[in-house]
């Protein structure tokens, strides 16, 4: 065999400094940091099919490690009936759409929906109808608009298969009124899917109390899990559709393609369960930290977008003051990223100064104040250029 001209050494020592050497402000990562117990558990199960040592043919039935018990317990935690592991919220959404809807049906969803909601419904050969938000600067989704969009589709005799709401969106961190949208869906007679990628695992969520029929959950985004991992949690009345089994291989659930996320990601999700169940009790304190950041940074020229006051940790700021400094600094738009990095802070997108997204979820008050003080210092120094 001819010798390959490949430098294999560069793949042997891959390492990452974010999170270990830098305070990570990236909202997509704040809820996914693993506690020590999860890192230890991964060590035991990082080999390929190690969770399948005692598998009887289906992942959700495995007793050692206690996957079966975990799925039962996490269903109670979520206020739902049945749960399965997935590779993430996007896969959870597709599973629901593909099993509950008919080809050509319409999915009614909010204007803040994540791109994966649209990709999932397109993959399932469905159509979308958007409930528009109220625009700048709040981008709020009005639950009553769902009723209007549904009525309009019904007047046109368009088939509706599913109502979808983004519980917390990834752009502005708006916490939507899921209970009201779920009530409208129930009154209209349509199943309701709640995308909880940024909520379950960060704040308390009870699916049935929110009138949800399905929850799409991200483990790596909000449940302190390695990636890729998520959950789909459902009401019992939909179990026969969502968890239907194969004609040729009766033990296998079709929508799961037999088995979904397994190995290290699933083990980390399970090992983090007690940590996650405990931290959601501190949600009020997380909101206080977030509002503190907003209050302090708006004093120096930042402007928080989205609903005020903040009800979620994800913050999006307009930052004209940073853009003004960038015009004077020889590093241009990279100055803010570089100044933060010097101070042991990361997670802000490189080269961005007009708008930034950040989160201090899970940080101590000391760390939060450190972040705020250093951003103030950077702006003060920039104003003196």
From Swiss-Prot:
Signal sequence range: none
Record-level GO BP terms: translation
EC numbers: 2.5.1.73
Chain sites annotated for binding pyridoxal 5'-phosphate: 89-90, 195, 218-220
Keywords: Protein biosynthesis, Pyridoxal phosphate, Transferase
SS bonds (residue pairs): none
Requisite cofactors: pyridoxal 5'-phosphate
Listed GO MF terms: Sep-tRNA:Cys-tRNA synthase activity
Reactions catalysed: O-phospho-L-seryl-tRNA(Cys) + hydrogen sulfide + H(+) = L-cysteinyl-tRNA(Cys) + phosphate
Family membership: Belongs to the SepCysS family.
Role according to the record: Converts O-phospho-L-seryl-tRNA(Cys) (Sep-tRNA(Cys)) to L-cysteinyl-tRNA(Cys) (Cys-tRNA(Cys)).
Oligomer status and interactors: Homodimer. Interacts with SepRS.
NCBIfam families linked to this entry: PRK09331.1 (NF006810), SepCysS (TIGR02539)
Protein name: O-phospho-L-seryl-tRNA:Cys-tRNA synthase
